[in-house]
Amino acid sequence: DIYKFYKLVENESHPHDYIDSQPEINERMRAILVDWLIDVHTKFELSLETLYLTINIIDRFLAVKTVPRRELQLVGISAMLMASKYEEIWPPEVNDFVCLSDRAYTHEQILAMEKTILNKLEWTLTVPTPFVFLVRFIKAAVPDQELENMAHFMSELGMMNYATLMYCPSMVAASAVFAARCTLNKAPLWNETLKLHTGYSQEQLMDCARLLVGFHSTLGNGKLRVVYRKYSDPQKGAVAVLPPAKLLSEGSASQHS
């Protein structure tokens, strides 16, 4: 079973805390990059697999290579190019990315960075991102469209925020489904079927789910609004506009865990 395999190997391809080893890059810069890439991803109408793989490539690369601040966007562009080639039938061309970055980088620079990243990551692009788990866990929740949209929204909020990297991909995915169920007041919030399919109990998901709901509650005030805009669209059920889960908001969750 491919999911059992992914569960076994997810920690091998999951980057852990690296930001302190990057002298010129901080969590905020990473968030700005991811925010921009989610926008680019939407413009190109790429698959969600491509988006999640892009962010995984960036984080794994930053965990093994010091990158100057001026090259961070170049890493992002090259990662999305690689992920697109891997996941899409019709990937964007290098020149599309040159134009998108307002010609900040040349065709040659993007291809050279792509090669550097591939070599550093030893050409490993078949990795379990939160997305592979999310699709399965949403199915196990027997969702309506609103729950599906909300779980994707929660997961992309997690992707934006460096703090989420503390948790392995399957836990982020399970927490996104749990946080979505809490936000939409689904009863029960968690059940044996979900526990069986995810491998996590409600208690195990509390911390990560609380983190995701915390991102939701501060989202409207921030400058990085791409995920908020994307999920405020009626096509996505405007789930971003719904009030954050009270059960998991700071202060109240301790009584329920």
Curated annotation (Swiss-Prot):
One of its GO terms (molecular function) is cyclin-dependent protein serine/threonine kinase regulator activity. GO terms for biological process: cell division; G1/S transition of mitotic cell cycle. SUPFAM superfamilies: Cyclin-like (SSF47954). Keywords: Cell cycle, Cell division, Cyclin, Mitosis. InterPro entries: Cyclin, Cyclin-like_dom, Cyclin-like_sf, Cyclin_A/B-like, Cyclin_C-dom, Cyclin_N, Cyclins_cyclin-box. GO terms for cellular component: cyclin-dependent protein kinase holoenzyme complex; cytoplasm; nucleus. It holds the Pfam family Cyclin_C. Essential for the control of the cell cycle at the G2/M (mitosis) transition. Interacts with the CDC2 protein kinase to form a serine/threonine kinase holoenzyme complex also known as maturation promoting factor (MPF). The cyclin subunit imparts substrate specificity to the complex. Belongs to the cyclin family. Cyclin AB subfamily. This is G2/mitotic-specific cyclin S13-7. It comes from Glycine max. The lineage of its organism: Eukaryota, Viridiplantae, Streptophyta, Embryophyta, Tracheophyta.
